[in-house]
């Protein structure tokens, strides 16, 4: 049984930055550090930070006065940002810069009174944060998930519309929704550059290549990770058995029955240590040396805030 590794896989620059922000805050200021929502959607990462003193909350009211608060990589609404400011909390923003780009698109639309349509999944924190950038009562902000949603959507002015997307969507599904938007609203304006982030696009391309060869595909990622779920769906659409797993412990030996090639990839919020543990487990079940597939090279780095770049020894 040959083990094939998708390339690229695992951490993206935005996730790496968000985790580093929490780690640096803990090093510089000690515990507790409060984080609004899971900083990234991965159980292993969140549990590790929790053990080091991070406290994950959903409501700003749960943060004591004068405490340090970190916004997650998914971003927050302006209402949440304003609430933190009014509470005089020390805030470090771990919002992925590529999510911030979409926030700015929405804010510009709101300022101009242009109605905005967001393609995304209802209830996802990134969507909630992005929708929360729009405040113009004379305009409108709408959420669609499918072409059917587009055809049922009612707007105020079909000639004054723009759209943007959640950063972690299925590329294929999103293009189908965009096609419907352009057909329904011919004058709609899209972003100058695709909102789906480079890491999402690259990992989806990699899992397609992986699915061409693998009989079964394991996607390392947590159930609440949007981009990890999309990877598993892509492999399934390719006709392959695909399993979204948090760790090697989730692997059932029966899933490997009859498999000659086993593919492994990881969502953008899954650390490499989990992938290595999966590889080790597959070897125990008869897998050979893991082979890296060819893929796109990623060298993007997002810096942490300058306030967190100081040496620990400078803090008394």
Swiss-Prot record:
It holds the Pfam family LYTB. Keywords: 4Fe-4S, Iron, Iron-sulfur, Isoprene biosynthesis, Metal-binding, Oxidoreductase. Its cofactor is [4Fe-4S] cluster. One of its GO terms (molecular function) is 4 iron, 4 sulfur cluster binding. The active site is at residue 126. Disulfide bonds: none annotated. Dimethylallyl diphosphate binds at residues 41, 74, 124, 225-227, 269. Transmembrane segments: none annotated. Its EC number is 1.17.7.4. Binds 1 [4Fe-4S] cluster per subunit. It catalyses: isopentenyl diphosphate + 2 oxidized [2Fe-2S]-[ferredoxin] + H2O = (2E)-4-hydroxy-3-methylbut-2-enyl diphosphate + 2 reduced [2Fe-2S]-[ferredoxin] + 2 H(+); dimethylallyl diphosphate + 2 oxidized [2Fe-2S]-[ferredoxin] + H2O = (2E)-4-hydroxy-3-methylbut-2-enyl diphosphate + 2 reduced [2Fe-2S]-[ferredoxin] + 2 H(+). Pathway: Isoprenoid biosynthesis; dimethylallyl diphosphate biosynthesis; dimethylallyl diphosphate from (2E)-4-hydroxy-3-methylbutenyl diphosphate: step 1/1; Isoprenoid biosynthesis; isopentenyl diphosphate biosynthesis via DXP pathway; isopentenyl diphosphate from 1-deoxy-D-xylulose 5-phosphate: step 6/6. GO terms for biological process: dimethylallyl diphosphate biosynthetic process; isopentenyl diphosphate biosynthetic process, methylerythritol 4-phosphate pathway; terpenoid biosynthetic process. Homodimer. Catalyzes the conversion of 1-hydroxy-2-methyl-2-(E)-butenyl 4-diphosphate (HMBPP) into a mixture of isopentenyl diphosphate (IPP) and dimethylallyl diphosphate (DMAPP). Acts in the terminal step of the DOXP/MEP pathway for isoprenoid precursor biosynthesis. Belongs to the IspH family. This is 4-hydroxy-3-methylbut-2-enyl diphosphate reductase.
